[in-house]
Amino acid sequence: MGFSLASTIPSFIFSSCKQKLKDLNLKISLQAYSFAPLLMSGKFDIMDFPEIVRNTYGLNGAEYWSIAFMNKEKDKNFISELNKKSEDLGISNTIILVDDINIQTMEQGPSLASLKKEERTKAIEYHKHWIEVASKINCHSIRVNLKSDVGSEEDILETSGESISKLAEYGSSYGVSTIVENHGGLTGNAKWLVKLIKDINSDFVGTLPDFGNNGFCMKRERLDLSNLTKPCDQQYDKYEGVKELLPFAKGISAKSHEFDDKGNDINTDFEKMINIIKESSYEGYIAIEYEGGMLNLFGGKGNYLAPHEGVIATKTLLEKLI
C-alpha cells in the first residue's frame, strides 16, 4: 500500500511525528477502519497493516476491522502469516471491530439484539467465528454492534444481554472478551449501555468508548455506513457518555473527522476527552480512528483529509495531549 503526500497538507501535521507519551499507562494504536476508502477501492490489504502501523506511523498497537479481512480470515495460512508479521514487528494486536455488513449493498446481517431468536442465533454464531480469529492473532477483544429497529429498551436489553452472555462464555475459553461500542441507537445512551454491562457481570464483557458524535446519536433515520453524514435527531452528551463508559472500557476509539488550522478536531474537544480519560482508571491503548475519508466518500460536506494525512493529524493531536 503506497502513500503520496500532497503539497497542500497543512504544516501542523508534520510538527510531531515521533510518539512522545507523557503518560506511560496510555498508548496510541491504529484502527484499520481509518483506511476504509482505500479498502473499497482495492488499495488496502490487511496483510500489510502490521507493517503500516510500525513503519509508516511508528506505533506498536494494531486494531483491526473485520470487513478489511475480505473473508481471508478463513484461510489458516493467511491468519498464521498475519500473526507472525505482527510478532516479528513487535506489534500488539488488540481488538477486532466486527461488522456484518455488505459494503457494496449496505445490507446488514442478523443482529445480536434482534427480538427473533433465530436471528440472534445466527448473529451469535457469526461472532463466535470472529472470537476464534481474534484468538489466533492475539487480540484480547472483539467489538460487537447492537442494532434493533423494533422493541422497547427493556426488550432489547434482555435480548442483547442473552446474546452477549453467550459470547462472553464462549470467548472465555479463548481469552477473548466481547465489548460493546457506543454506536448509535440504544448504545448511544451510555446509561442504558452501562446497565447492560452491569447486568451481564462478566470479566469477558466491556465497553469501547468512542469520541464520535455518531456513536452517541440515540435517534436517527437509520444507523449504518451510508448515513454517516446525516443529522442526529437526539444526541447524548458524548463527554458525559465517555466518562460513564470508561469504568468498563477495554479500549478507546479516538474518532476524528476534520481539523482546523491549529490541528484540533473541529467536532470533538480532544483535550477535554483525554483529561476525562486521565482522570479515570483506564490504562491501555487509545486507537486512532480517522473517519474523515469515509465521510468524504459518502458525500459529507467538509474539508476532509485523505486517510493517511488524517491518521497523521490524529496521531499528532493525541501525542500532544497524552
Task: List each model region and its residues.
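Active-site acidic/histidine proton-transfer and metal-coordination neighborhood
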Residues: S4-F12, K20, E51, K85-P209, ...
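C-terminal segment of N-terminal export signals and the immediately downstream linker at the start
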Residues: S11-Y33, L38-S41
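Hydrophobic faces of well-ordered beta-strands that scaffold small-molecule active sites
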Residues: L26-Y33, N60-Y64, N93-V98, I142-V144, ...
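Active-site beta-loop-alpha junctions enriched in small/polar residues
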Residues: Y33-F35, W65-F69, V98-I101, K147-D149, ...
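Catalytic domains of carbohydrate-active enzymes, especially glycoside hydrolases
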Residues: D45-W65, I137-N138
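Acidic/histidine-rich catalytic cores of soluble enzymes
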Residues: G61-A62, G161-N275
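Glycine-rich, proline-tolerant flexible connector loops at the mouths of alpha/beta enzymes
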Residues: G61-K84, L146-S152
